[in-house]
Amino acid sequence: MMSFGGADALLGAPFAPLHGGGSLHYALARKGGAGGTRSAAGSSSGFHSWTRTSVSSVSASPSRFRGAGAASSTDSLDTLSNGPEGCMVAVATSRSEKEQLQALNDRFAGYIDKVRQLEAHNRSLEGEAAALRQQQAGRSAMGELYEREVREMRGAVLRLGAARGQLRLEQEHLLEDIAHVRQRLDDEARQREEAEAAARALARFAQEAEAARVDLQKKAQALQEECGYLRRHHQEEVGELLGQIQGSGAAQAQMQAETRDALKCDVTSALREIRAQLEGHAVQSTLQSEEWFRVRLDRLSEAAKVNTDAMRSAQEEITEYRRQLQARTTELEALKSTKDSLERQRSELEDRHQADIASYQEAIQQLDAELRNTKWEMAAQLREYQDLLNVKMALDIEIAAYRKLLEGEECRIGFGPIPFSLPEGLPKIPSVSTHIKVKSEEKIKVVEKSEKETVIVEEQTEETQVTEEVTEEEEKEAKEEEGKEEEGGEEEEAEGGEEETKSPPAEEAASPEKEAKSPVKEEAKSPAEAKSPEKEEAKSPAEVKSPEKAKSPAKEEAKSPPEAKSPEKEEAKSPAEVKSPEKAKSPAKEEAKSPAEAKSPEKAKSPVKEEAKSPAEAKSPVKEEAKSPAEVKSPEKAKSPTKEEAKSPEKAKSPEKEEAKSPEKAKSPVKAEAKSPEKAKSPVKAEAKSPEKAKSPVKEEAKSPEKAKSPVKEEAKSPEKAKSPVKEEAKTPEKAKSPVKEEAKSPEKAKSPEKAKTLDVKSPEAKTPAKEEARSPADKFPEKAKSPVKEEVKSPEKAKSPLKEDAKAPEKEIPKKEEVKSPVKEEEKPQEVKVKEPPKKAEEEKAPATPKTEEKKDSKKEEAPKKEAPKPKVEEKKEPAVEKPKESKVEAKKEEAEDKKKVPTPEKEAPAKVEVKEDAKPKEKTEVAKKEPDDAKAKEPSKPAEKKEAAPEKKDTKEEKAKKPEEKPKTEAKAKEDDKTLSKEPSKPKAEKAEKSSSTDQKDSKPPEKATEDKAAKGK
C-alpha cells in the first residue's frame, strides 16, 4: 500500500486531473519536510510489499522512477497554473488511487502466491520424475542380472548339447563295431553250417558204402554156403563111387576113381573162375564208386569255394555299404540335432525378441502417454504462468505510470535527491503532456481490444485474405506511424530536455544497474521474440494443431510485431525507434505486448520464453539454462530456441519485414537472406526471394520449415547450443552493467551488424568459425572486443558453437535492419552507410516525395547488396579496428544524442498503432487517411538525422581511442560486480521478481536518461 504520508497537508496550489479522460494520469504534490514520506524512494510500496528484500531495489529506483515520470512531472507543472479550484479533486483522486493501488497490490500478491504454489508443484513433479527414473534404473539393473544368468544358462545348454552330440557319435561308433562283430558271427555260423552239410554228405556216403558192404557180405556168405554144399555133395558122390568100386571090383574101382578125379578137377576149375570173376567185379565196382565220389566231391568243393568267395565279396560290400550308411545316418542325426537346437534357440530368441519388443512398445506407449500428459501439464502451467506474467506486466505498467507521475511530482516540487531546475524547453511541454496521456490511455484500451480481436481474427480469416489485409494494413500502418513518430519525437525531445535538467549525473550514477539490466532483459527478450515469429510460422505445434493458425501466418505476423519489434526498441531504442516505423515501438509497446501475448495462441508460447528469459537471463543464468532445455523439450517450441536462434538471423528479420510488408521491407529480406549461411547462397537468390516474402507470408511459412530442418542438424552438432545462447544472454549483464555500456551498446550494435553482415555476405557458409567467434563477440559487446579471452573462458559453449554467435550477431542486427526499414532508410546496411552514405542521403532526400519513389529505392538498395558483396571485405578489416573506439562513452552518447533527436516518442504512440492494426483493420484504414500528412513530416526530420550520423561516427572513433584505457578498468570492475550479483541472485528470488517488474520502468525511463547523457556528451 503506497504511503502518501502528507495527503491532508497537500500544497495549497491547485491540482486538477490532467486530461480528464484518463484516470491513471494525475499529478500529486506533497510538502517537503521531515514529516513527509517519499512514496517511491523510502516507502514500502505495494509493488514490493510481498518481499522483504525489495528495499534495496526500491532504494536504487529513484532515478528510474524519476526518469519514468518525466512526462507526469512536466504535466503537473502545467496543472499548477490552473488555479485553486482543482485542489480538492486532487485529494479525492489521490485517495481513489490509493484504493486502486491497494486492490492491485492485493491481486498481485495473490498471483505471486499462485506462482509459488505452481513452483512447489513443479518441484514435486520433478521429484516424482527423479523417483521414476531411479525405479527404471533399478529395473534395468535387475534385467541385467537376469540377462547374465540367462546367458550363463544358455551357454551351459549349448555345452550340454555339444557333449550330447559327442556321446551320440561315440554310440554310433560302438554300434558300428557291434554290427561288424555280428557280421563276423554270421560268417562263422555260415561256415559251420557248410561244414555240417559236408559232414552230412560224407555220412550219407558212408552209409551207402556200408549198405554196399552188407550186400557184398551177403553175396560172399551165399557163395560160401554154396561152396559148402557143393563140397558135401561132392564128398557124397565120391563115397558112393568108392563104395561101388569096392563093390564091383578093382576095375570098376579104377574106372570110378578116374571119373571122380575128372569131375573134381572140373568143379574146382569152375569155382576158381567164378571166384576170379567175382573178385574182379568187386574191385572194379569199388574203384568206380571211389572215382565217382572223388570227382563229385571235387566238383562240389570247387563250387563251394566259388560261392564262398562271391558271398564273401558281397558280404564285404554289404558291410562297407552298411558302414557308410551308418556314418551318413550318424551325420544326419548330428545335423538334425544341431538343427533342432538351432531352431529351438531361434524360436527362443524370437519369443524373447517379441517379448522385448512388446515390453519396449508398452514402455514407449507409457512414456509417450506420460510425455503427452507432462507436455499438456507443462503447457497448461505455462499458460497459467503466462497469464500471471501478463497480469503482472499489466500491473507493472499501471504501477510504473503511477510511479512516473509521483516521481515527476516529487522532482518537480524539489523533494527528489537531486535539485530540480526548469528546462529551457518548458513552454512546449503542456501540449506534449496531454498527447502523451491520451496515447497512454489508448495503449491500455487498445491492448485489451487487440487481445480479443486478434484471437477472433485468427479463427475466422483464411490465409489469403489475411495476407492481403495484413499487407495493406501494414503499409498504411507504416505511413501512420511515420507521421506519429515525428510528433512523438518532438514530445520525447521536450521530455528529454526536462529530464536532463533535473538529474544528469544522478541518473547516470544512480541507475547503472537498472539501465544495464534493462538492456540485458531487452536483449534476452529480443532473441526469444525474434524466435517467436519463426516458431509461429514454422515450428509451434499450435500451428500444426490449429489449421487456422497454420493458414494464417499473416495473423501470427500481425501478432508477433510486439514480440519481433520489441528487441529493436529494447536493444537500441535510440536509432531504432525513429527509423523503424513499426518495429521500434517503445517499451510502452513492450508493456502492452504482455497482455496481448496472454490471449494470442502463438504468444502463449513465445512470451513464456520472452518474459521467463527477461528476468532469468538478467539475473539468474542458471534458471535460463534450465528453462532453455525445457523450451527445447516443450511441444509448443518443438525445436529448441537454439535452433531458432541459429537459423533465425534471417528468419527473425524476415518475419519482421513481412509484418511491415511495405516496399521498404523488400530490402530487408534481401539482407536477411544475404546474411543467412543457410538461405542465401547468393545475393541474387536473396533478391529473388525478397519479393516473394514481401508478397506472401505463406511463402515465408513454406520456407521456414526448410529452415526448421537445418536447425535440427545444428542441434545435433551442438547440444550445448540450447544452453549457450542463454548463457551468452545471461552474461550480457556482466558485459554491460553500466549506463555507459548500455548506451554504447546501441551504437555499437548498430555497427556490429555491419560486421556481421559483411561476414555473412562474404561467406554465406560461415567460412571460419574462429573468425566468426572473434568477430561476433566483438560485434555483440564492447567488452568482448577488449577481452575475447575472457569471453571464451566464460562461455566455452560460445567457442563450440560459432553458429550461435553468428545467430546472435544477426539478432543484434535486427535494430539495424529496423533502421533500414524506416521510410527514411537511413541505414539500409551499416556497410552501405559507410561506403555509400552520399548516394543514400540523396535517396533519402527524395524519400518524402512519394511511396512509389520509396519502392524504387528499395529495389535499388536490394541490388546494392550485390554490388557491395566485394566491399564487405574492406569494411570488415576497417570495422574490427574501429570497434574498440566505438565502445567509448563519447561515441555512445553522441550516437544516442543523434538517436534521441530522431527518436522522440514512438514508444507510446507505436503500441497503440500496432494493436489497433491487429484488432480493428477497418479502423486502421480510416486512420490512414488522417495520418498520411504526418508521413511526410516523419520522413523529413530523419534526413538531417541521418546526415548527422555519418559525421559523429568518424568523430567517435578518434574519441573512443583516447578513452579506451579508461573504459577497460570500468568494464572489468562492472563484470566483477555482475558476477557478484549473479551469485547473490539465487538467495534473493523475491528481489529478482521485484527487479523483473521494475524492468518496465527501466525501459520507460531509458529515453530521458539517454537524453541526459547526450547533453553531457555535447557539454564535453
UniProtKB/Swiss-Prot annotation:
Q: Which SMART domains match?
A: Filament
Write out the ranges of the annotated region (Linker 1): 133-145
Q: Keywords, A to Z?
A: Amyotrophic lateral sclerosis, Cell projection, Charcot-Marie-Tooth disease, Coiled coil, Cytoplasm, Cytoskeleton, Disease variant, Intermediate filament, Neurodegeneration, Neuropathy, Phosphoprotein, Repeat
Q: Where is this region: Tail?
A: 414-1020
Q: Tell me the segments the record calls region Coil 2A.
A: 267-288
UniProt-annotated stretches for the region Coil 1A:
101-132
Region Head, as annotated, extends over: 1-100
sequence repeat windows: 525-530, 531-536, 539-544, 545-550, 559-564, 573-578, 579-584, 593-598, 599-604, 613-618, 627-632, 633-638, 639-644, 647-652, 661-666, 667-672, 675-680, 681-686, 689-694, 695-700, 703-708, 709-714, 717-722, 723-728, 737-742, 745-750, 762-767, 786-791, 794-799, 821-826
Name the domain of life.
Eukaryota
A Gene Ontology annotation in the biological process aspect, one of them, is:
intermediate filament bundle assembly
Q: Which InterPro entries match?
A: DUF1388, IF_conserved, IF_rod_dom
Q: Name one GO cellular component term.
A: cytoskeleton
Q: Which Gene3D superfamilies match?
A: 1.20.5.170, Single helix bin, Vasodilator-stimulated phosphoprotein
Region Linker 12: list its residue ranges. Answer: 245-266
Alphabetized SUPFAM superfamilies for the sequence: Intermediate filament protein, coiled coil region
Modifications made to the protein after synthesis: There are a number of repeats of the tripeptide K-S-P, NFH is phosphorylated on a number of the serines in this motif. It is thought that phosphorylation of NFH results in the formation of interfilament cross bridges that are important in the maintenance of axonal caliber.
Q: Name one GO molecular function term.
A: protein kinase binding
Composition skew (Acidic residues), residue ranges: 459-475, 483-498
Disease link: Amyotrophic lateral sclerosis: A neurodegenerative disorder affecting upper motor neurons in the brain and lower motor neurons in the brain stem and spinal cord, resulting in fatal paralysis. Sensory abnormalities are absent. The pathologic hallmarks of the disease include pallor of the corticospinal tract due to loss of motor neurons, presence of ubiquitin-positive inclusions within surviving motor neurons, and deposition of pathologic aggregates. The etiology of amyotrophic lateral sclerosis is likely to be multifactorial, involving both genetic and environmental factors.
Q: What is this protein called?
A: Neurofilament heavy polypeptide
The protein's organism comes out as: Homo sapiens
**Organism lineage string:** Eukaryota, Metazoa, Chordata, Craniata, Vertebrata
